[in-house]
């Protein structure tokens, strides 16, 4: 969404927060955004140069500086601008190892070099999340970062992207699955600043083919209990928010080229059943879903399956999301 002006953004955000305040739950609205700072050769012709925000290189351009301190400075500047606009979660950085040069999302990554990606990930997240002078690093200048895409979106088969059915698989012919995890384990989950780890993680659309070592499922990453619950939550100890990529519970298109839902591996399930499967896998939040009905239907199905008391006891999503909301001192 483009912004007419800083004033318009602030008015819109203030009105939205007032609406949330009047619900009685005391939960502020968390506005998130894909990267807004990238400058490109076509920006002037697309009418986005007037947006009230500074322009920087994209991921691969930031890496070309070979300077993590510069990237941290960008994060500090970017977070100040985001907070001024009412944005409190950055749907970035994209920390996939870009090992497939044909991939259309290559330019948004920090490149193919593992250690460079680790260093840039730390700098980016520390810059966006840290408020200086606070005990835990969180405060009025902090913006949550949502690192993407777990467990690494780079090894896309043939360079085809998983936004489309023809690119639904991530493959590991060289058995380098563990290498693609390093930007998460050594970067996003091991920050140098006081916030310690990226606040949120987004799994990619892909089916990480033959990577499920426990249940043997070839399903999209957000539906894969082994990857989210067993690996990310338990083995790696991640206790932040897990948010799905956009539209994974929606129906697919009629052709492989159609830009539609991305429920890879669970096309046979209903929309509500897909929500339930993702929740059972361990996700907290659904990206791009604007309808609460299938979520409530999934909750009802879970109550029937496990019992209401057990279902409520199993849910830790509220704890993750509440921390995500309040640590920024809204």
What are these regions (language model features)?
Residues 1-322, 327-328:
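Glycoside hydrolase catalytic-domain context in secreted enzymes
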